UniProtKB/Swiss-Prot annotation:
This is Pathogenesis-related protein. Probably involved in the defense reaction of plants against pathogens. One of its GO terms (biological process) is defense response. Belongs to the CRISP family. The lineage of its organism: Eukaryota, Viridiplantae, Streptophyta, Embryophyta, Tracheophyta. It comes from Cucumis melo (Muskmelon). Signal peptide: none annotated. Keywords: Allergen, Pathogenesis-related protein, Plant defense. InterPro entries: CAP_sf (IPR035940). It comes from the Eukaryota.
Length: 41
């Protein structure tokens, strides 16, 4: 996982870790929305 490698490099310079949250955001976004079809001509 590239986030683990990135966090290892950050730890070497004394910076805190980052967290991968785009998957949780996308899942929540999809669950909160309703599929609506547009009117056709």
């Amino acid at each position: 996982d590239f986030v683990d490698a990135h966090n290892a490099a950050r730890a070497q310079v004394g910076v805190g870790p980052v967290h991968w949250t785009v998957d949780a955001y996308a899942r929540q976004y999809a669950n909160d929305r309703n599929l609506v079809h547009s009117a056709t001509r």
